[in-house]
Amino acid sequence: MSRFPAVAGRAPRRQEEGERPIELQEERPSAVRIADREEKGCTSQEGGTTPTFPIQKQRKKLIQAVRDNSFLIVTGNTGSGKTTQLPKYLYEAGFSQHGMIGVTQPRKVAAISVAQRVAEEMKCTLGSKVGYQVRFDDCSSKETAIKYMTDGCLLKHILGDPNLSKFSVIILDEAHERTLTTDILFGLLKKLFQDKSPNRKEHLKVVVMSATMELAKLSAFFGNCPIFDIPGRLYPVREKFCNLIGPRDRENTAYIQAIVKVTMDIHLNEMAGDILVFLTGQFEIEKSCELLFQMAESVDYDYDVQDTTLDGLLILPCYGSMTTDQQRRIFLPPPPGIRKCVISTNISATSLTIDGIRYVVDGGFVKQLNHNPRLGLDILEVVPISKSEALQRSGRAGRTASGKCFRIYSKEFWSQCMPDHVIPEIKRTSLTSVVLTLKCLAIHDVIRFPYLDPPNERLILEALKQLYQCDAIDRSGHVTRLGLSMVEFPLPPHLTCAVIRAASLDCEDLLLPIAAMLSVENVFIRPVDPEYQKEAEQRHRELAAKAGGFNDFATLAVIFEQCKSSGAPASWCQKHWIHWRCLFSAFRVEAQLRELIRKLKQQSDFPRETFEGPKHEVLRRCLCAGYFKNVARRSVGRTFCTMDGRGSPVHIHPSSALHEQETKLEWIIFHEVLVTTKVYARIVCPIRYEWVRDLLPKLHELNAHDLSSVARREMREDARRKWTNKENVKQLKDGISKEVLKKMQRRNDDKSISDARARFLERKQQRIQDHSDTLKETG
């Protein structure tokens, strides 16, 4: 199991009388501490102690700006206090008298952490005056006045209350990240004010907060609304390009050794100050922690380290699937004489601020969800970060003192491989879920919806087609009763479709654990250490064997049921190398999905079906109802080809129980694809062709344009234009033909033929005469 957090260094020095033992110092329990250590706190009206922030000098002006404008853009450097202080100011100014102050975050970790921080500052219990809501977890009450939530949760609020009558202020935070849901919220809020709905609250205010973004463009989108700039307080940060990655290495992400080397060089050669390292995901982070620990263990602190006050290195991972308690540790001061090193995903670039960071190691890459048009699927890829993201990362080193940023890539990589800004998610991912949401909000014209950056029309039409294939919309593009039910589920449409199909057969118990497991982080622990790795793989194979050894979906169900039924689930997870936190989340998800299904089945018109057959067949048939777009047939050897019309080759991922059994298979369905050296299908199960025979034609039978009223109207107009042009060409051809016919008729009468013959004989006689004259001259 993971040994981190852990301290690598020499044995602790003898404890002096009155000195605290070396441990994480939790005398300041706040979840996030941003203020400078030397500055004194100030007391809020709620009685809590609040650190000093740059935003405090702008408090009165900022409150007045919110009062005076329906839309306001607030910009300032990360750490200026926007996220934690502005909602408090508005609460203390009385805005919550007209409704809640809602604050969105793109990530649930940030929503929870910031809510904890603000609740501590306001001296209240989390869930009372200050609460949060993330997917599958609502920690709020009727008393809640400030509610932090993911942007997806606000979208769910709009589904039930399009006029947002329960809110007085909506704050869209971290707008520069341009998530898909945030962009949709931009359009919905703009439309809410444009339509001037009679039920809209007059007091509703919208604040958009961004650290780095095209502010003029955003202001123009919201009717040239004012931009309120909070002057920053950043210390200078020196940048160093380490030149370990160049433009040719854009596709090569095997850079862990380089990251660890640079980090260790900082620890040995730089003065005291904590280190923040940016990597792309959990596997890279855990591997780097292990390698860094091994190197730090061999350091002689009497000779190797330039700063003699240092006795060790505290290594702390930070990624989304960690527990809240584990995440809290990264914000606590390290023990005396110990340097803290946080190895994190991109979440620490903007959403969270860690005090004491003086050195940043920028790995230059991030995991990003991109739509692959060749496969017709969204794929999580490792790509270079943007220049704006790189500046965000380096800014973390200049929060409390001057700092340094070590970029492992070269200047050429910066200029040639890194875009200026983040590509908005709406322009690079599937739109299926949000298009369904818009349809359920009676926004039928999804093509001309007010987007800040309009997505490619192809992505919209593809989303419409997928919704039709799931029976969420009809051939006219109108949402169906099933579609209205599907939008209530916090699942992708295809997975929701499979769950509802199972419910109609009264076998939802088979699908709900699987749906819950697919909704959380990867549950399998795959350690870096080779010895532990073999043990983990053996345990995972045993679990797959209990599910029949031939169905990855069923393996997830077995893990869910066995862990839940064990007397000590945490110990069971440790024994089987499974993430207990992920399983615990899956239990909560399954309970909420079960409640949604219960309410759905109470409806009088809910369809009921019967099927006589073994459970394993019912399970796979229900999966086919939602995953028939992800059907593949074996072509040659171990290669499969998708059946969606693209015929893309895919291979079964090595982690699957079906890996190396490909020759026994003919047809499969899969949950997702992963692109590395090959295109791999993950979470796979075998099926029979007859189960999808009637479903596959839906992938091809309808033109996507038919599902959009606007597209249909444009197609009709285009068809009329083409028909008119065709008729004009036809008439032109007819006119030409008639003229040619007249000429032919004139040429074919007796007189014309006689005249033509006479002209031919005359020309022939002339040629004979010319030839005779030539012979005489030469003779």
From Swiss-Prot:
Gene Ontology MF term list: ATP binding; ATP hydrolysis activity; nucleic acid binding; RNA helicase activity
Nucleotide-binding listed as a keyword: yes
EC number: 3.6.4.13
Region (Disordered): 1-53
Positions of short motif DEAH box: 173-176
Limits of the Helicase C-terminal domain: 263-442
Keyword Nucleotide-binding: yes
Residues annotated as binding ATP: G76, N77, T78, G79, S80, G81, K82, T83
EC class of the enzyme, as a word: hydrolase
Chain ranges of the Helicase ATP-binding domain: 63-231
Compositional bias ranges of the Polar residues kind: 42-53
Biased composition (Basic and acidic residues): 13-41
Catalytic activity: ATP + H2O = ADP + phosphate + H(+)
Short name of any one Pfam family annotated for the protein: HA2_N
PANTHER family from the UniProt entry: ATP-DEPENDENT RNA HELICASE (PTHR18934), ATP-DEPENDENT RNA HELICASE DHX40-RELATED (PTHR18934:SF271)
The protein's role, per its UniProt record: Probable ATP-dependent RNA helicase.
Family: Belongs to the DEAD box helicase family. DEAH subfamily.
Protein name, UniProt field: Probable ATP-dependent RNA helicase DHX40
